[in-house]
C-alpha cells in the first residue's frame, strides 16, 4: 500500500491518505481534488524514475522535485512557501519540504521487487484531440495535456481495425491513408471524429488510449534512454538476481491510471457502463491501478455497487475555509450509497 501526505498545495491544507488499487475522490469544484490526483500521479512517476535509474539525485537537486510537479501538471501558483509532500511505498520513501528546500529519500526492503508500470494521466481536456483536427501541428507546453496527446497518437495509429466503444453501438478506427480518425455511429454512417457528439469526443480518447496501453503491457521498448537505464541497473545487481529483477524493470507489467472527470459529457447510464469497464481493467493476474477524480454521483454509485476491500473513497472537506482530504468510513460509504444524488448536496456532513 502507498501512503501520501500533502500539505499546503493549492487549496489543500492537508491530505493524508492510504492509496489502494482503486481510489476515488469526490468534492466540489476548486476544492483540491485534482491536486491530490496530480500529486499521486507525479509521485508514482517519481518512484518509477528513481527505480529505473537507481538514484534520486535529479529530484534532490535545485528544487527539481517541485519544479517538475509544477511544470508537468500545470500547478503554477499552487506551490506555497510551506508546501510539503511525502510518499511511501513498499519500495521507497521520499519527501520534499519547500520551507527548508530539503529532499529526503530512503530505500525500503522491497526495493528490488518493484515492477515497472506505465503511468498515465488522462486530463479533463482530452477532447482537444477531437475538437482541434490539426492538434499535432499546434505547439503545446510540455505538460500532461501534451503527454496525453503523444500517447493518443500512438494508440490511434495502432487502432486500424474497428474498435467497439463500450455499449454505445459505436466503433472507432484510424485511417492511415488519410491520417484521420473515423467513427461509425449507430445508423452505419461513418463520421470524422471532429464531427461527432461531445460525449464521444470525451470518451473515445480515453477508451482507445486505455484499450491500447492495457493490451501492450508486456512489450519491451528499447529507446536509447532505456538502454542507458538498463546498463546502470545491471551494474548494481548481483549475478543471481539479474534475470528476475531485470525482467521486472524492462517489461511493463501493469498500468497506473489517473483519470480526471470520466463523466464528462456522458449520459448517466453511459457513465455507469464506463466505470464497469474501468473496473474490469483492475482485475486479472496483473491488475492495473486506478485513481479517479469525479463530480458525478452516477460514477461514484457504480464504484460503490462494486465495492471490495481494495477501493478507497476520499472527499474534500471545508473546515473553516481550509480544505482537507478525508477518507470515507464504512458508514460514510453506506450513507452516500443510500442517499445517492442527495448525498452530494450534503457532502460537508460526511466530515
PLM features: what roles do these ranges have?
Residues 14-20, 185-186, 248-253, 281-285:
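Phosphate-binding P-loop
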Residues 9-11, 24, 31, 126-129, ...:
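Short, solvent-exposed loop/turn segments at secondary-structure junctions
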Residues 40, 44-256, 319-338, 343-346, ...:
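Phosphate-coordinating catalytic segments in nucleotide- and nucleic-acid-processing enzymes
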Residues 264-266:
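ABC ATPase nucleotide-binding domain "signature" loop
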Residues 269-351:
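C-terminal lobe/lid and adjacent interdomain/linker elements of RecA-like ASCE P-loop ATPase modules
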Residues 1-42:
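Pre-Walker A-like glycine/lysine-rich segment at the N-terminus of P-loop NTPase domains
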Residues 22-24, 119, 254-258, 289:
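Residue-level preference for the first positions of well-ordered beta-strands
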Residues 260-262:
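Walker B catalytic acidic pair
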Amino acid at each position: 500500500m502507498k501512503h501520501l501526505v500533502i500539505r499546503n498545495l493549492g487549496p489543500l491544507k492537508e491530505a493524508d491518505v492510504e492509496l489502494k488499487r482503486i481510489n476515488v475522490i469526490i468534492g466540489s469544484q476548486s476544492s483540491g481534488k485534482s491536486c491530490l490526483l496530480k500529486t499521486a500521479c507525479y509521485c508514482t512517476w517519481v518512484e518509477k524514475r528513481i527505480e529505473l535509474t537507481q538514484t534520486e539525485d535529479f529530484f534532490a537537486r535545485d528544487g527539481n522535485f517541485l519544479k517538475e510537479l509544477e511544470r508537468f501538471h500545470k500547478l503554477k501558483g499552487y506551490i506555497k512557501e510551506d508546501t510539503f509532500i511525502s510518499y511511501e511505498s513498499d519500495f521507497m520513501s521520499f519527501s520534499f519540504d519547500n520551507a527548508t528546500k530539503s529532499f529526503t529519500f530512503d530505500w525500503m526492503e522491497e526495493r528490488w521487487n518493484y515492477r515497472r508500470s506505465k503511468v498515465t494521466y488522462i486530463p479533463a481536456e482530452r477532447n482537444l484531440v477531437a475538437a482541434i483536427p490539426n492538434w499535432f501541428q499546434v505547439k503545446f507546453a510540455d505538460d500532461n495535456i501534451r503527454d496525453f496527446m503523444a500517447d493518443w497518437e500512438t494508440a490511434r495509429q495502432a487502432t486500424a481495425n474497428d474498435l467497439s466503444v463500450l455499449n454505445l453501438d459505436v466503433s472507432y478506427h484510424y485511417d492511415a491513408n488519410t491520417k484521420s480518425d473515423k467513427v461509425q455511429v449507430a445508423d452505419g454512417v461513418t463520421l470524422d471524429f471532429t464531427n461527432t457528439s461531445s460525449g464521444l469526443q470525451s470518451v473515445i480518447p480515453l477508451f482507445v488510449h486505455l484499450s491500447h496501453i492495457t493490451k501492450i503491457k508486456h512489450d519491451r521498448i528499447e529507446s536509447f534512454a532505456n538502454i542507458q537505464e538498463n546498463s546502470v541497473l545491471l551494474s548494481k545487481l548481483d549475478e543471481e538476481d539479474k534475470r528476475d529483477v531485470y525482467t521486472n524493470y524492462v517489461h511493463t507489467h501493469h498500468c497506473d491510471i489517473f483519470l480526471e472527470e470520466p463523466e464528462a459529457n456522458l449520459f448517466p447510464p453511459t457513465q455507469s457502463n464506463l466505470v464497469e469497464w474501468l473496473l474490469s481493467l483492475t482485475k486479472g493476474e496483473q491488475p492495473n491501478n486506478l485513481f479517479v477524480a469525479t463530480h458525478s454521483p452516477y460514477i461514484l454509485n457504480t464504484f460503490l455497487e462494486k465495492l471490495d476491500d481494495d477501493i478507497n473513497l476520499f472527499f474534500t472537506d471545508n473546515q473553516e475555509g481550509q480544505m482537507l482530504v478525508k477518507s470515507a468510513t464504512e458508514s460514510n460509504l453506506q450513507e452516500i450509497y443510500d442517499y445517492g444524488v442527495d448525498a452530494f448536496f450534503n457532502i460537508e456532513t460526511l466530515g
